[in-house]
Amino acid sequence: MLDRFSRTQLVFGKEAMDRLKGSRVAVFGVGGVGGYTVEALARSGVGAIDIIDNDKVCLTNINRQIIATGKTVGKYKVDVAKERIEEINPDCKVTAFRTFYMPETADQFDFTQYD
């Protein structure tokens, strides 16, 4: 029976897919590069993704950010990205942080929990 990751498993193998499913990744900034990154991680079968950004989608993002569309302008990027990830991979646990990573917010993140 085919599932959403059967083609990926053909390339990586079952053991690697199990490792991806059990992994947790943090992506800081989900605009340009980060938006494409979280989508690729979700499509690869990563089991948990923490996304960190405090910016909102604006009109000038549409030409270069995968999460930016006419419908997403004005919304927080992490909220848009979370919804997109959950559509792609409903089994992925997504935690959205509406904050920027700064010295004063660094203690919010336990880096030992990420792979």
Task: Give the ranges of each region predicted by the language model.
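Glycine-rich phosphate-binding loop and adjoining beta1-alpha1-beta2 segment
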Residues: 46, 51-89
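Glycine-rich, flexible N-terminal cofactor/catalytic loop recognition
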Residues: 27, 44-47
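Conserved N-terminal Rossmann-fold NAD(P)-binding element of oxidoreductases
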Residues: 27-29, 52
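N-terminal charged helix/coil linker that caps or initiates catalytic domains
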Residues: 1-26
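Hydrophobic/small residue at the entry helix of a nucleotide-binding pocket
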Residues: 33-34
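Aromatic pocket-lining residues of Rossmann-like dinucleotide-binding sites
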Residues: 41
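A structured beta-alpha segment of the ubiquitous adenosine-cofactor-binding alpha/beta core
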Residues: 74-114
